[in-house]
């Protein structure tokens, strides 16, 4: 399917809201276009609706283009906007591995979308045939959390690419815990998988859960539609400022995550049953 066939018709047809900050990108000594109070400084101006500075920093760290990044109020907004963009209420369905992160099913219920869980194998690996057996003509999204919450295992990138290539809808790989995995990220594979969305977050390795900032990486056409669907100023200025400070510590975050992985492996070694 093409992206135009996957997106809800009303979303494709809508005229997106344009705010004052979208309509003028230059510099000015005075701003009168949004009825902001100019007598008090600090928090009186609307924030950048596209969070350009934060995205530029993320693009450099993850090796993608700014046009491939969407920022949401936590990953939960990224999850919800996926439903609102692609799934027709009362008509379409989604398929997800089970057990997994609970917000996929919660957002499905909120958006009146049928949720089809597919049990993992006993070793928590993906049952690909069962996964695709649950898919029908109205299946719009596959949800795969990797590393999976709550089982903790990450799935081989080759398997995830195979699934995303085979499925004709939108495949979402939720990488909230990717910084604690040795397998790596699906982000570098976005160029050859135009229907793939990769979600990440500031809440785990970045130790910034209070910011409520989630990330979706995808083809620029998907990101463009997300930007049309989202609320105009979804990421406030305080979050944007704090995110830039957090991103300054990228090297330290990588070091701490590596240390945690090393300690995790050591704990597993000492708590594993001894061979008999």
Language model features with spans:
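Phosphate-binding glycine-rich loop
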Residues: 55-93, 111
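Short glycine-rich anion-binding loops that position phosphate/pyrophosphate groups of nucleotides
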Residues: 35-37, 76, 101, 147-150, ...
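PLP-dependent aminotransferase class I/II
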Residues: 195-269
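PLP-dependent aminotransferase-like
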Residues: 88-144
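N-terminal "arm"/small-domain region of PLP-dependent enzymes with the aminotransferase-like
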Residues: 1-61
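Active-site pre-lysine segment of PLP-dependent enzymes
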Residues: 109, 126-137, 150-208
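Conserved small/polar residues in nucleotide/adenosyl-binding loops
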Residues: 270-276
